[in-house]
Amino acid sequence: MGSHCPLVSPSVGMISAGRQDYQKFFMCRLLGYLGQPLRPEQLIYRPEHSLIVQSYQPQEMTAGLLNADGFGLGWFDQESLPNPYLYKNVLPIWSDINLPHLSRYIQSSCFVSYVRSATPPLAVDLTNCQPFTEEGLLFVHNGFINNFRTTLYRPLRNLLSDASYQFIHGTTDSEHIFALILDNLRRLRQTSPGDSDWAKTSLGKALEASLLTLVELARQHDTFFSANILLADGQRIVACRYASRQPEPSLYWLANSERCPGGVIVASEPLFADQKWQACPSQSILVINSPEAIAVKVLANSVA
């Protein structure tokens, strides 16, 4: 079987009003897993439309042809929670000679991975390479803020706490979005100190609050953004598929498949042909606490 997944139809039309706005932006590809311990190479390398294949032959990118500006893998070890591990490189993922061995050695019940297609003029260096990690979280982002340096760069930084401001080491809009999420997460911790279900709901709430802030900032500064995000804390993954102007980048999920029993996969594109792949709805947040506990929340429509 080839790398194309014929049983799954694209969730986003490739021709639409406003598509020309996206031509100068490049989209990354994301992958997340939660479930029974799994070697990352089983999703990064083995499937017919694996993350490796998506790096050079993506099927549903709204712009760009290659994801060759670096990659990253972040994973949790149950014995070392809540501190995740990272492996990143600015090489194209297919050029790294260590990742095949590392991804075959690791076993993890929660990991995320990413291949990058950098938006010019952002630098291709390790500080800009995802996943980002802070406070026991892993973060990957596929999307952009239009004209970030001249639109939301200063407004976003002005909103951040000192801790989140100092956390930023690179120049990407992605890292600034993560910093905003961290601040919202800290506020939730302060307001819900005795909530036993706090951990199950806080990541989704912090992500939603951050998206609403971005919507308002984009409106104020006459710009737009897209944000497909994966957040993981080792016990759960929270994802979103969101854009303030269509089309949104593609995002899918699959639970308890024959090829991956006891697990949930979230990916920019289906890794293999399976009728059970589900496209995340537009403007939605996906909260995965286990393969049997998955919730989808569609946010109020704010697309321009």
Swiss-Prot record:
Question: Enzyme group, top EC level?
Answer: transferase
Respond yes or no to whether keyword Transferase is given for this record.
Answer: yes
Q: Which InterPro entries match?
A: EgtC, EgtC-like, Gamma-glu_amide_hydrolase, GATase_2_dom, Ntn_hydrolases_N
Q: Does the keyword Iron-sulfur apply?
A: no
Enzyme Commission number(s): 2.4.2.-
User: Could you tell me which residue ranges the Glutamine amidotransferase type-2 domain spans?
Assistant: 28-299
List of catalytic residues: C28
Q: Which UniProt keywords apply?
A: Glutamine amidotransferase, Transferase
- Gene Ontology molecular functions: transferase activity
For this chain's UniProt record, which GO biological process terms are given?
A: ergothioneine biosynthetic process
Q: What is this protein called?
A: Putative glutamine amidotransferase slr0199
**Which organism's genome codes for this protein?**
Synechocystis sp. (strain ATCC 27184 / PCC 6803 / Kazusa)
Q: What is the lineage of its organism?
A: Bacteria, Bacillati, Cyanobacteriota, Cyanophyceae, Synechococcales
